[in-house]
Amino acid sequence: MNRNLFDFKPSEWLPVKDKAVLEHCRNIKREEMETTNENGYSIRVVPHPSSAVACELFDWIYRSDVEDKKTVIVFPNSWKNIYTSVANMCNVFNVSARNIHAFCMDEYADEDGNVAPISWNRSLGGHFMTEFYMQFREDLRPPLRQMHYYTNENINCYSEMIEEEGDGGADLIVSATGWVGHTAFIDPLTKAFKADNLEDFLKIKAGFVDNHRLTIQQNSGGVSPLWHTPRYSVTIGPYDVIHAREHLERHDLQNVGGYASWERMISRLQLYGPVCMEVPASIYQLTKGTIYVSEDMARPIEPLDLIAL
């Protein structure tokens, strides 16, 4: 971007304001994107990340069945197309999910810390149960006691529940990055995830969070009334991300036909920027896993020029 003609500072409420970092990430080329770091964090550019993630998730369930192995997975919400596809594949090929122990990644809450019940029509846990669990043939479903979602009673011990069920941590966390650079609702510039340094940040467990304004906007769908979108949530913490043994992510565009450059930008900040609290999802760089990035997401970020007529 030509800043010689007109330059300015990013708004203070944006988590990342370092212009050098922003320019570096913005200028990452398609041919430079596929990498694997020393931790085994692999970036793959594919036409349809959702299909790739669905196949990977099916493989996890298949292996848990044929190896008769308990498998603890933290699931994001709501991924209807992926979840129904995975369940349908299991139904067609008679793959049992009996060994899957599922934990919902996050949920909405009110200003008093009350967790949204799964009976609420916008409950993230409710959508997960409908879109994943209920899509399995009854004889292939996990026991209901193995499906975990947030309640008022478990929010203060949710990380411990994952840790206990998974013998130290989840076997797999499935995720995607939000507009503000979060994973789950681990939002930057919030009291819940304030820390003096990265080491302390990585110790923060599940809890209640007053969400960043960009998260509220994204949760509204970008078009719904903001006052009808909960401002608060409950979520896993960085501790849960770091202690999971494997990680599976997808980055694919959601808005205006792939023209939303801010989504491409936050993807690059997570993948190629410094590991930092300002981009919480950047901590995945410290873990083993695979992230599938869409070809649309990998397109160059080119600002529109104003042309005098």
Where do the PLM segments sit?
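A glycine- and small-aliphatic-rich helix-loop capping segment at beta-alpha/alpha-beta transitions
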Residues: 86-97, 119, 188-197
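Glycine-rich phosphate/diphosphate-binding loops that line cofactor/substrate pockets in enzymes
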Residues: 56-69, 241-242
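A short secondary-structure junction signal
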Residues: 159-160, 183-190, 194-197, 259-263, ...
